[in-house]
Design a protein with these regions (language model features):
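Repeat-based blade/solenoid architectures
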Residues: 60-69, 116-124
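Beta-propeller fold detector
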Residues: 111-120, 168-172
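Structural signature of eukaryotic scaffold interfaces centered on beta-propeller domains
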Residues: 69-77, 127-129
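Short consensus segments that form the blades of beta-propeller domains
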Residues: 61, 90-94, 145-151
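Short beta-turn/strand-loop junction motif enriched in small, turn-promoting residues
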Residues: 71-73, 88-91, 141-144
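Acidic/hydrophobic-patterned starts of short beta strands in beta-sheet-rich repeat architectures
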Residues: 77-87, 134-135
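Short, surface-exposed beta-strand/strand-loop-strand elements in extracellular ectodomains
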Residues: 98-104
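Acidic, small-residue rich beta-repeat scaffolds with periodic aromatic anchors
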Residues: 3-52, 123-172
Length: 172
């Protein structure tokens, strides 16, 4: 009788372990430094975290960088880790534009969603995850401030990934 109980207990522990293992998010080797990103409908293929595209009839370039502010989570509920990070882009003028970018980890290739504009010359602070929401914190300027002023107003924006799109959540 004791042997039966021990065998049943071992069997149940193994089954529970297998179920737990397969219920956890699986890690996929997403390398956000070497992905294609969609910004304003255009593709920018980053290599080692950077892309340079010459602007026709100009000596300027569109330079796009991946920042080191990022977080990993299963944003689209497919049990595979995704990455949310910040992209910086200079289009040849005085501005440095910041975007929230998400790459889904469904396969070995990067599958990015359309990036969301955060601001011009803002000061990124962090990206967090809470209840599958992406929370981006950064400093910005007041509307009446000059672009030469340092950003000093704390901004916190929240996003969800739905149907392979970033959707902003406006807190009530």
């Amino acid at each position: 009788m004791n042997k039966k109980i021990i065998l049943i207990t071992i069997f149940l522990v193994v089954i529970i372990g297998i179920i737990y293992y397969f219920s956890q998010s699986k890690s996929v080797d997403i390398d956000p430094l070497n992905c294609n990103y969609i910004i304003n409908g255009e593709n920018f293929n980053l290599i080692e975290g950077k892309s340079e595209i010459e602007i026709p009839n100009s000596s300027s370039k569109i330079i796009t960088y991946y920042s080191n502010i990022e977080t990993y989570n299963d944003f689209n509920n497919d049990k595979i880790n995704d990455v949310a990070g910040l992209i910086m882009q200079n289009t040849g003028g005085s501005g440095t534009f910041f975007y929230l970018a998400v790459v889904l980890g469904g396969n070995k290739e990067c599958q990015s969603v359309e990036s969301v504009f955060l601001g011009d010359r803002v000061s990124p602070q962090s990206i967090e995850v809470e209840d599958n929401r992406i929370i981006v914190n950064y400093l910005d300027r007041a509307l009446e401030d000059s672009m030469a002023d340092f950003p000093s107003i704390i901004i916190s924006r929240q996003f969800l990934v739905e149907n392979n799109r970033l959707i902003e959540i406006i807190p009530e």
